[in-house]
Amino acid sequence: MGRFIFVSFGLLVVFLSLSGTGADCPFDWSSFRQYCYRVFKQLKTWEDAERFCSEQVKGARLVSIESYREAVFVAQLLSENIKATKSHVWIGLSVENKGQQCSSKWSDGSSVSYENLVKPFSKKCFVLKKESEFHKWFNVYCGQQHLFMCKFLRPR
């Protein structure tokens, strides 16, 4: 009887510790609010990283960052997973040229409601840099190869 209680208590502790921290996300993905996130340490161009994300899980795209709190979560997750001192990580932000005007948008189609740009954009794709502790957005050429992070809406 004592062993049953011990095992039951252990399972309860595991269940409670997992709830809200990735329990509803696939293995190796992390949870924040209603989304799942994963850092990939493969070098890819922006376009190849975006395609790779979409092949991992239905609805996955390069990460979009929609608030300061989400930016802090993303920076923390990247810092935990990437130890190299000079790393760049693709995010889903890109610039579209429409004639004389440029507009930025997330690869998942959402509008840019939160910005943390270092300087105005002259190139078309964006990364987070380790040197800024993954807090600032830098624009770089889309054909460069970098690490990347994917995000998708967690199933209910």
Curated annotation (Swiss-Prot):
Expressed by the venom gland. Residues 1-23 form the signal peptide. Snaclec that dose-dependently inhibits platelet aggregation induced by ristocetin or low-dose thrombin, but not by high-dose thrombin. Binds to GPIbalpha (GP1BA). In vivo, also dose-dependently induces thrombocytopenia of mice and platelet counts remains at very low level even after 18 hours intravenous injection. PANTHER family: PROTEIN CBG13490. Its main location: secreted. Keywords: Disulfide bond, Hemostasis impairing toxin, Platelet aggregation inhibiting toxin, Secreted, Signal, Toxin. Pfam families: Lectin_C (PF00059). One of its GO terms (cellular component) is other organism cell membrane. It comes from the Eukaryota. Belongs to the snaclec family. Disulfide bonds join C25-C36, C53-C150, C125-C142. The keyword Disulfide bond applies. Residues 32-151 form the C-type lectin domain. The lineage of its organism: Eukaryota, Metazoa, Chordata, Craniata, Vertebrata. It comes from Protobothrops jerdonii. One of its GO terms (biological process) is venom-mediated suppression of platelet aggregation. It is found in: Secreted. PROSITE patterns: C_TYPE_LECTIN_1, C_TYPE_LECTIN_2. One of its GO terms (molecular function) is toxin activity. This is Snaclec jerdonibitin subunit alpha. Negative results: does not induce platelet aggregation in either platelet rich plasma or washed platelets under high-dose conditions. Does not inhibit platelet aggregation induced by high-dose thrombin. Does not react with polyclonal anti-GPVI and anti-GPIIb antibodies. Heterodimer of subunits alpha and beta; disulfide-linked.
